[in-house]
UniProtKB/Swiss-Prot annotation:
Gene Ontology biological-process entries: translation
InterPro entries xref list: Ribosomal_bL36, Ribosomal_bL36_sp
Organism: Ruminiclostridium cellulolyticum (strain ATCC 35319 / DSM 5812 / JCM 6584 / H10) (Clostridium cellulolyticum)
Protein name: Large ribosomal subunit protein bL36
Gene name tied to this protein: rpmJ
Record family assignment: Belongs to the bacterial ribosomal protein bL36 family.
UniProt cross-references to Pfam families, sorted A to Z: Ribosomal_L36 (PF00444)
Any Gene Ontology CC annotation: ribosome
KW Ribosomal protein (keyword) present: yes
Keyword Transit peptide carried by entry: no
Keywords, alphabetical: Ribonucleoprotein, Ribosomal protein
Gene Ontology MF: a single term: structural constituent of ribosome
Superkingdom to which the source organism belongs: Bacteria
Length: 37
């Protein structure tokens, strides 16, 4: 899980979602997981 000031999708399987008011990227590839904060 990477924490970044701005999250971006890396591949076409990455999805941007909102969880508990936080913007996150979820993907099949665990290296692509990101959280904004």
């Amino acid at each position: 899980m990477k924490v970044k000031p701005s999250v971006k999708t890396i591949c076409e399987k990455c999805k941007i979602i909102k969880r508990k008011g936080r913007v996150m990227v979820i993907c099949e590839n665990p290296k692509h997981k990101q959280k904004q904060g």
